């Protein structure tokens, strides 16, 4: 039962972008709707949990949420350019690399020879996995010469990675508990969502529809907080990376993104390598 709880965040988070695309609207309406959904769910959690608030917790939570909006909005922009099945392995890999390196440099996480070996191997696996998952078909290469969508998508994902990195590490730097940060984060997410999208007139029916992915995201967060004390941070972190399977294969199977046989093989091997790397990083943290 505990492992099942720990897998739920991956299932929930892995399905978010599939819901975003299926529910329609551009990345701006999708971002705004998702943040609103997260706020609604977080208010409900606050009513039942009653976490402790201080000015520091509130401020850190809001800043964290603002940067989550940067990460999510740019991830959705990348999906709009290069698709879910290409965006998500690259995005997940970049997030793992950035958070791991930050953990090593700032928090000195890899303190033993074993953890250093595991960590370095994991980073190599991630890089190889990203390369394999981002293979282009002949048609895509020809289209790239004209539009340059893949290059644009990668640049946007680098910005997204910075957003997600700050979202994750700022709460840790100030030792803010996840339950306490949940509502302030959601408030920051909505503020960030509005600031990043209001010029593009995102307030429409698609923003309302995309409240659903926001509810799903917040539910995934809740199950992460519940599972961590039961299975440990390392295990819950490793299992949460499995969402890449749902989002990537969902992009191909559910959303109908076309791939060549070579690309499919590259994506599958790339996903496996990134998942293995996630497990190795979890072990290196423990």
Swiss-Prot record:
Pfam families: Sugar_transport. It is a multi-pass membrane protein. GO terms for biological process: sporulation resulting in formation of a cellular spore. One of its GO terms (cellular component) is plasma membrane. PANTHER family: TRANSMEMBRANE PROTEIN 144. Belongs to the GRP transporter (TC 2.A.7.5) family. NCBIfam families: RhaT. This is Probable glucose uptake protein GlcU.
